[in-house]
């Protein structure tokens, strides 16, 4: 299944706020109206919608998300929390959380078009897994810096998660540590996502 490129508002109306996909918000009460029209949700549908929420927020294909679930399942600790950490430490998501891109698809474009350096080297793979002490900067070119400045100027200036530091005048972000699950930028029940996949096998 390919990455979703359809109407974004349609997805947030059904699944709720997905800040990584779009900075738009569903109208108040729209999720309640949808639920009342469709009746009581089955447990399968609840798990499916949590999985879809995760997939659309981080802009992943079904195959990519399944791969992350399998990696998390082999790691020590809670599979759900490890899964969220893996997704949150992707380069495209780090750029989004720093405010250097308005959305995760926007961050992915910055990376794909070679506007971003990690530790002084161009990285053009959006799924690059960032680690503590990584230094993320814009290329020293006017076009790269203008794109990031536009995003910084229009960002909502929400409190940065504790694992990141931003130096806006240097177009630079620092990864201080692996993210703590309480700083994840999406309201999600990750255990339902893990349950969804465990029941598919």
UniProtKB/Swiss-Prot annotation:
Positions of region (Disordered): 15-43
Principal location class: plastid
Coiled coil: none
InterPro entries: Ribosomal_uS4, Ribosomal_uS4_bac-type, Ribosomal_uS4_CS, Ribosomal_uS4_N, S4_RNA-bd, S4_RNA-bd_sf
GO biological process: ribosomal small subunit biogenesis; translation
Keyword entries, A-Z: Chloroplast, Plastid, Ribonucleoprotein, Ribosomal protein, RNA-binding, rRNA-binding
GO cellular component: chloroplast; small ribosomal subunit
Pfam families xref list: Ribosomal_S4, S4
Subcellular location: Plastid, Chloroplast
Database matches in PROSITE patterns: RIBOSOMAL_S4 (PS00632), S4 (PS50889)
UniProt GO MF annotations: rRNA binding; structural constituent of ribosome
Keyword Chloroplast (UniProt): yes
Residue ranges occupied by any S4 RNA-binding domain in the UniProt entry: 89-152
SUPFAM superfamilies: Alpha-L RNA-binding motif (SSF55174)
Gene3D superfamilies reported for this sequence: Ribosomal Protein S4 Delta 41, Chain A, domain 1, RNA-binding S4 domain
The protein's role, per its UniProt record: One of the primary rRNA binding proteins, it binds directly to 16S rRNA where it nucleates assembly of the body of the 30S subunit.
Family: Belongs to the universal ribosomal protein uS4 family.
Subunit structure: Part of the 30S ribosomal subunit. Contacts protein S5. The interaction surface between S4 and S5 is involved in control of translational fidelity.
Protein name (record): Small ribosomal subunit protein uS4c
UniProt source species: Panax ginseng
Species classification: Eukaryota, Viridiplantae, Streptophyta, Embryophyta, Tracheophyta
């Amino acid at each position: 299944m390919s990455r979703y490129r359809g109407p974004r508002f349609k997805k947030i109306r059904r699944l709720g706020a997905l800040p990584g996909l779009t900075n738009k918000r569903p109208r108040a009460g729209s999720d309640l109206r949808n639920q009342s029209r469709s009746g009581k949700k089955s447990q399968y549908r609840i798990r499916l919608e949590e999985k879809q929420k995760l997939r659309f927020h981080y802009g992943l294909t079904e195959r990519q998300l399944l791969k992350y679930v399998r990696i998390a399942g082999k790691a020590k600790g809670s599979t759900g929390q490890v899964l969220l950490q893996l997704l949150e430490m992707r380069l495209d998501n780090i750029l989004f959380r720093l405010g250097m891109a308005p959305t995760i698809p926007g961050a992915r474009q910055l990376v794909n078009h070679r506007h971003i350096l990690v530790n002084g080297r161009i990285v053009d793979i959006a799924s690059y897994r960032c680690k503590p002490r990584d230094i993320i900067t814009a290329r020293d070119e006017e076009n790269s810096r203008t794109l990031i400045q536009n995003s910084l100027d229009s960002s909502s200036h929400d409190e940065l998660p504790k694992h990141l530091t931003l130096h806006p005048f240097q177009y630079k972000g620092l990864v201080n540590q692996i993210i703590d699950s309480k700083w994840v930028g999406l309201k999600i029940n990750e255990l339902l996502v893990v349950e969804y996949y465990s029941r598919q096998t």
